[in-house]
């Protein structure tokens, strides 16, 4: 949330880092939003999104925006964020909506989420600087706060909200865990562009590509490579030893 809140939005740093991205040839950036920033400062949030898009466009970088997310910290708050924990990966990353939905009052949070998603989509539905809307990152989650197939109803709802607005950009939600059968089925049947995550080696990655090709739609790998998992040619060699 620090990226988007008024007190910590930092266009100078964004400009510098997107400049580095441009220098190494990146032409698309995947960027996470959060409903709580919208809820506390709707118009300011949208102005900052537009400012980000202007900076990215200056560096010839298009944007994929992400709405919901089942990864990392399930509890969060607006305002000053916790300090990073040294040595802890993504220690400050906040889910959206997290426990506010999965352990809270869905009758309260659902209308907020619907208004948020529709407002952002309506505002930017014809913005050519946005190449795709990634509606839900890794639905089902992982680790000690895994929601599993319980994420399916919310996934279905956000696709319904997206189709109601019908933006000019494609809608998608990336598959990432083949054990989540019902989630995967819905994601693959309803995504305009097939997006996916893999942290496996080259051979396994190619097998996944071959499997997803059957849907006959464009494909984008929106997350890959992890040094600790040896995501290279050598990874497949290690796994066969």
Please place each PLM-identified region on the residue numbering.
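Short acidic/histidine-rich active-site segments
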Residues: 221-226
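Active-site mouth of glycoside hydrolases
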Residues: 1-193, 197-206, 214-217, 228
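Conserved small/polar residues in nucleotide/adenosyl-binding loops
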Residues: 230-237
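The feature captures the conserved acid-bearing segment of alpha/beta-hydrolase catalytic domains
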Residues: 211
